[in-house]
Each structure stands twice: as structure tokens, then as C-alpha cells.
């Protein structure tokens, strides 16, 4: 049984701080995208009352601690961590922000973003704040290895953008 808090720490030799280069690939790792969390960043700034629960349900992200723990294990893997040039979690703003902050110029293919269910439109895919997802930038030649290592932790990993 595991209990406690998570502290984000890694040996310095496992961390790279590099500017993504032309041709690098952004891989989305972890949970699938759904309608949960759409508008969460703006929803947290609104005034709320007793009726808010009826209208704001989609703004609330639905966590998945099992997937979160798998992501933690993956990032502790030195072989994986050394491939990552830059990464970002999916907080406020979803794909737009998490991937958009990684490089100055990106080509994002929303059709490749893994979905929890069908019927999501482009805006929902772009702004969903579904949790337990990370966007990582790796060199094109490291994509297959990154996907394989994620798979060893039972995590989905999908290339969704290029620099």
C-alpha cells in the first residue's frame, strides 16, 4: 500500500532543458481526453451559488490516481526522462496551453488526440482539462522508444504534434 504526498524531484543528470528543434515530436502520454474540465480555468474564477452544481459539472476535472501513479513511475525511468527535451502537464487550457507552451511553432493534429468517447468537437479537444495527461517533446528518432516505455507502464502514448 502506498500513502503520502508526491514531491517532484529527479536527479539532475536525468533532466534535460533544451529548446525543441524543428522536426521534434510532441507525444501525449496518459489519460484520454473528454468533456470533463472544459472551461475549468474560467469556471474556477466565477462567482458560485447553490445552483452552480447544476451548470458547472463539466468544468470539474475527474482525476484518475492509478494513471497518475503510472505517469510518476514513467518519469522516474532514467531512460525515458533523458529523452524528454521539455514537458508540460495538462492544467488550465488543455491541449491549447499544455502543448502550445512547449515551443514557438507547432503543428497540432487534434484528430490524433486520444478520446474517452466519440462526439468531441475540435474546441472540446483543444480546451479539455482532463487530468493525468502529459505532453512531452522528444526527438523524432526517440518517438518509438518513448511510446514503448510508456506502454511498459500501461500508459497510452500518442504523437500529436510536430515542432
Where are these regions (language model features)?
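Glycine/proline-enriched, intrinsically flexible loops and inter-domain linkers
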Residues: 1-163
Amino acid at each position: 500500500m502506498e500513502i503520502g504526498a508526491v514531491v517532484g524531484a529527479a536527479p539532475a543528470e536525468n533532466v534535460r532543458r533544451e529548446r525543441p528543434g524543428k522536426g521534434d515530436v510532441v507525444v501525449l502520454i496518459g489519460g484520454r481526453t473528454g468533456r470533463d474540465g472544459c472551461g475549468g480555468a474560467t469556471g474556477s474564477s466565477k462567482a458560485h451559488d447553490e445552483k452552480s452544481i447544476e451548470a458547472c459539472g463539466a468544468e470539474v476535472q475527474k482525476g484518475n490516481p492509478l494513471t497518475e501513479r503510472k505517469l510518476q513511475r514513467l518519469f522516474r525511468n532514467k531512460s525515458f526522462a533523458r529523452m524528454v527535451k521539455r514537458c508540460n502537464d495538462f492544467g488550465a487550457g488543455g491541449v491549447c496551453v499544455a502543448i502550445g507552451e512547449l515551443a514557438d511553432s507547432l503543428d497540432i493534429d487534434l484528430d490524433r488526440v486520444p478520446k474517452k468517447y466519440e462526439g468531441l468537437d475540435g474546441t472540446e479537444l483543444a480546451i479539455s482539462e482532463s487530468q493525468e495527461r502529459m505532453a512531452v517533446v522528444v526527438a523524432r528518432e526517440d518517438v518509438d522508444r518513448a511510446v514503448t516505455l510508456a506502454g511498459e507502464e500501461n500508459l497510452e502514448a500518442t504523437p500529436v504534434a510536430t515542432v
